Amino acid sequence: MNIKEMAHTSHAGLVITSLDEGDVTALTSDYLLNQLHTHGYLILRGFRHSIADFSERVRSTSSRISLDPARSFDGDTAQKVDAGYDKVGLHCENGNSPFWPDLCWFYCQKAPTQGSQTTVCDGKAVYEHMNAAQRAAFTSQDIVYSRRVDEKKWKTYALHALAGQPGAPTTIDDITLEHLYAVAQSDVGMRIDKLDDGAIRYSFQTPAIIGSRLNTKETHNFANSIFGPSNNYETPVITFADGSPIPDTLLAEMDDLCESLTVDVGWQQGDIVLIDNTRVMHGRRRIEDKDRTIFNALSYV
């Protein structure tokens, strides 16, 4: 296979281009993950592409797939990005919940003709540019996300997350709260309360500045979901761990800093983007081309 590697920005990202329309599934997982360790996100460009190729690429690099049942499916791996047309703030995918995957993938089946770009922001670079007061504010205590989730949504999520595992429940009626705990990260600060109507309210405590799960040397990344969306779910309440709100002035400062380090993917037809979801945040410019078609997948190494 004939490929060319080129930096996407001066501080993060790598574009891996096939010069002969090669098979994207022929790239080894070790090669991709090693490059991801260094660069934070990858853009695979110029390869032969289809939903089937994308799904196979995701499965071969992952130990487990995470599906959001609130989105539309294309097979058992890819889901269509359908989060309306407005701008989407920077976030780690599912970073406001204890179901936070390692890897975030995108596949561009049809590139936008104008605007409508997915954006990326390297949390490592953000941390390096934070001033002492900003670092102190976010390292002195964790942040907490809390919200209510309807019974059907949390049970459907658990059903999909456990699918294929030995002894997994086969219908939504078999799902219990223990099943939901089973698919959460075991090392997170999580509390789940079941409500009278079968819904749950969860709280998830996590640092705003975290270490990458993929590269243990990258210990300080401003990677979180304090600016992120809540499509298909109730908007979470976001506070510091002591219950105090994050000051508007601090949020505005961080928003400006992150925006200064945010870049567009620059979609081309057939692109696949792979993101370290514990280092690099992503978002979206306002949709101007409603015919663009992007698929997403979430997974664990």
List each language-model region with its residue ranges.
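Short, acidic/polar
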Residues: 24-33
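A gly/proline- and charged-residue-enriched helix-loop-helix capping module
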Residues: 66-92
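Catalytic domains of carbohydrate-active enzymes, especially glycoside hydrolases
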Residues: 34-41
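Active-site environment of non-heme Fe oxygenases that use a 2-His-1-carboxylate facial triad
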Residues: 1-23, 84-90, 99-272, 278-301
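Residue-level recognition of conserved beta-strand edge/terminus positions
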Residues: 45, 276-277
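Glycine-rich loop at the start of a catalytic domain that most often binds anionic cofactors/ligands
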Residues: 51-62
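Catalytic micro-motifs at enzyme active sites that drive phosphoryl/nucleotidyl and oxygen chemistry
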Residues: 31-32, 89-97
